[in-house]
Design a protein with these regions (language model features):
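ATP-dependent adenylate-handling active sites, centered on carboxylate activation for C-N bond formation
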Residues: 1-250, 265-274
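Hydrophobic, amphipathic alpha-helical faces that serve as interaction scaffolds
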Residues: 256, 261-281
Length: 282
C-alpha cells in the first residue's frame, strides 16, 4: 500500500511521459502502477545490435529487452524498442560527457540512458519514470551477498561512521538498514544524478519512483533483515523478497521467476577486468 501510494503520487503529471523499462523487478513494478493512472505514457526499452565485444559478450542484456517487450504486450502498454548500435557508443558517450561533465560509471551504462532519453525527447516526453534506487531500499544488489559474511556489517558501518556525511541519528540499531542507508547515500545518489542529468540535457524531468520520502522513511523504520529474506535458487542478496513475493500480484511471472540479476548496462565487454581497469585509470 505504501509503495503503490508513493509511486502514484510521484507519477502524477499532465505531461507526456515515458518509462525506461528493463526485464527487472524494479522498473516493472513502477510500470504495473503507472499504466493504470490514465497517463500519456510510452515505454522505452533498450535493445542491442548483434555485434561482438572485444573480449566477451554479456548477452543477458539482450534477453532483458525481450522480457520487457513481453511485459508491455501482456499489459497492452505502448512501447518502443530503441536499438543501441555498438558503432555509436563512442559518439553517444562523448555527447553525454560533454553535456553533463560528470564521469559517472562507464560507457556501457551511460549510453543506454543517453539514447533512450534522446528518443523519448524526440517523441515529446517531458517526464521520465525509472525504477532507480529500489535496490538501496528493498535490497537486490550483488554485493548484498557480503552482508552475511562474519564481521562485514560491523566493519562497514564503522567505516561509514568515520565520514561526516553519514547520519549519527538513525532508526534504531539495525545493521541491515544501516548498510542499505549507506547504499542510498552513495550508489543511489550517483545513479539518480546520472539519470537526472541525462534527461535534463533533453529538457525532461526524471522521477525515480521508489524515492517518495514517506515510503523511504517507512522502509527504514521497519526490520531490515525482513527485506533480506532469501531463496536457495537465487544468488544471496539478490532475491528482493518485498517485490518478488509481497508484491507478487503486481509483477508478471516471467519477471518474478527470472533468477539472474542483470542490472542495466550494455553487452559489449561489460565488467571485463581489462575495461574495469581502464575505467579506474581514467
Amino acid at each position: 500500500e505504501k509503495l503503490i501510494e508513493s509511486i502514484s503520487k510521484i507519477a502524477k503529471t499532465k505531461q507526456k511521459c515515458g518509462l525506461f523499462l528493463s526485464g527487472g523487478l524494479d522498473s516493472t513494478m513502477v510500470l504495473s502502477i503507472v499504466k493504470d493512472l490514465g497517463l500519456d505514457l510510452t515505454v522505452y526499452i533498450c535493445g542491442y545490435d548483434d555485434t561482438k565485444g572485444l573480449y566477451w559478450n554479456h548477452d543477458a542484456f539482450r534477453t532483458e529487452s525481450k522480457l520487457a517487450v513481453k511485459t508491455c504486450k501482456m499489459w497492452k502498454v505502448p512501447y518502443k524498442v530503441i536499438t543501441l548500435q555498438q558503432e555509436l557508443m563512442y559518439h553517444y558517450d562523448r555527447e553525454w560527457l560533454n553535456h553533463t561533465r560528470y564521469p559517472w560509471s562507464d560507457r556501457n551504462r551511460r549510453c543506454p540512458r543517453y539514447m533512450l532519453a534522446k528518443f523519448a525527447a524526440k517523441d515529446g516526453c517531458k517526464v521520465i519514470f525509472t525504477g532507480d534506487s529500489a535496490d538501496e531500499i528493498v535490497t537486490g544488489y550483488l554485493h548484498h551477498g557480503k552482508f552475511w559474511e562474519e564481521g562485514y556489517k560491523k566493519n562497514k558501518i564503522k567505516r561509514y561512521q568515520e565520514y561526516k556525511w553519514y547520519p549519527k541519528i538513525r532508526h534504531g540499531n539495525d545493521a541491515w538498514n544501516d548498510l542499505l542507508l549507506g547504499d542510498l547515500l552513495i550508489t543511489s545518489e550517483q545513479n539518480v544524478l546520472a539519470t537526472d542529468q541525462t534527461c535534463g540535457m533533453f529538457g525532461m524531468e526524471s522521477r525515480p519512483c521508489f524515492l517518495g520520502q514517506n515510503f523511504v522513511k517507512w522502509c527504514y523504520q521497519h526490520d531490515g533483515f525482513f527485506k533480506f529474506k532469501q531463496h536457495p535458487e537465487w544468488n544471496t542478496g539478490t532475491y528482493k523478497y518485498l517485490l518478488r513475493e509481497v508484491m507478487a500480484d503486481y509483477i508478471p511471472e516471467h519477471i518474478r521467476n527470472k533468477k539472474k540479476k542483470v542490472g542495466w548496462s550494455s553487452p559489449w565487454d561489460n565488467n571485463h577486468d581489462r575495461t574495469v581497469k581502464l575505467a579506474r585509470m581514467l
